[in-house]
Amino acid sequence: MASGLTAQEEYTFDLSEIEKKPFHFGGYLEFRPVFLDLDRDSLLYNLRFYDLDEGESIAEYNFNALLDFSYDKGIFSAKIRTNTDITKSFSGWSHETTLYEAFLSVKPSLSFHLDFGKKRMKWGKGYAFNPAAFIDRAKNPNDPDLALEGFVVISVDYIKSFKGKLRTITLTPVLLPVYDHINSDFGEWNKLNFGGKVYFLLYDTDIDIMFLSGGSGPARYGIDFSRNMTSNFEIHAELAYIPDYSKKVIDQSGSVIEENYANTSYLLGIRYLTRSNTTFIIEYFKNGSGYTPSEMDDFYFLIEQAYEDYLLTEDDTQLNFLAGGESQAYRTFAPMQDYLYLRISQKEPWDILYFVPSLTSIINLTDGSFSLAPELLYNPVTNLELRAKITVLVGKDRSEFGEKQNDFRLEFRGRYYF
């Protein structure tokens, strides 16, 4: 009898313990101190700190909480992602909570999905740049893996599978409304934009064809592909074409003019993994909306002139204008036209478990300036990630990285996942 009871106890288990729970809560908490060594002779330093004396360096302390809530049961699922930033900088304390994603999904079959709400579309194949990501916010090439805020959309995925060289087709039509309280920063208000993407898995190659139109911005068309040439070597590319693009340019007189032209942007990239677990990511980015050397030189000339006028008259009107929205494209990531991105990372060198050093460089091929960022990533215990990163900026006067507000940036990051 005792033997029988032992056998029954050995093979008894609770089905509820292995069933997938419909609710999930996760995310991470992060602390990220940043130290900047300021370049007090640079033009962008003068533009931002012209009326302040912050010394040779400044410190910034960032606290971040990314929270994910999801529900998945039957044909229905939902996801909410929020991001809270609390920052202590030279200007004081600030905080902001942003709803990154909040959408409902209905999946009545494996071939049909309907999504409604705020979400990221994640179009494009580039790692650091995505010129064909028409319904996504631009990545930060200095940290491409950062979570980003989505847009409110209605999208459908219809998936069809085949036998043969063409394995899969997915049709993804998208509606994107733009009003004063919905996607208000996307473009012109009171417009209902329509876009779409067609995905093909053809000859073991991922191919996307996409478009977006509707009036909030000029119509645009794109294509991308990625293919694993071998198990450790991948190539990818994407192209965006905007036939009626309008670019704001500030000329030497300080007037804002609009240049209209057909804009073509594209990206070519590779990802290669060696036998020793070294990963190389290389991308060339042609930014068709970027500024020419003469246009950037005009902008730098205006800052220099405005700063000299401020020193003589204490009139900062022109400096405030150059630091405002009209010139934002001059001060964003990759403001010019030709860039090379390189990242080299080594997994667990010298048999140090959970340790990944890397080196990243972004090179402006037009003016020769560049950033160089060595980084150390370590996971000492489960769910805890520690990162140390130094970014050094190198460039001559009137070059992109030579005129940044700082010479180098030292950053630590502790992130706990749950």
Language-model features: locations:
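Extracellular/periplasmic loop regions
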Residues: L44, E234-K347, L359-S361, F401-E403
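Outer-membrane beta-barrel "beta-signal"
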Residues: V156, L342-I344, Q405-F418
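Residues that define the transmembrane beta-barrel architecture of outer-membrane proteins
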Residues: S57-F63, H95-Y100, L148-V152, N190-F194, ...
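Extracellular loop and loop/strand-boundary signature of outer-membrane beta-barrel proteins
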Residues: Y50-G55, T87-F90, A138-N142, H181-S184, ...
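Transmembrane beta-strands of outer-membrane beta-barrel pores
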Residues: F31-D37, K73-S77, T84-K88, K118-K122, ...
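Outer membrane beta-barrel
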Residues: F63, D68-L176, F200, G395
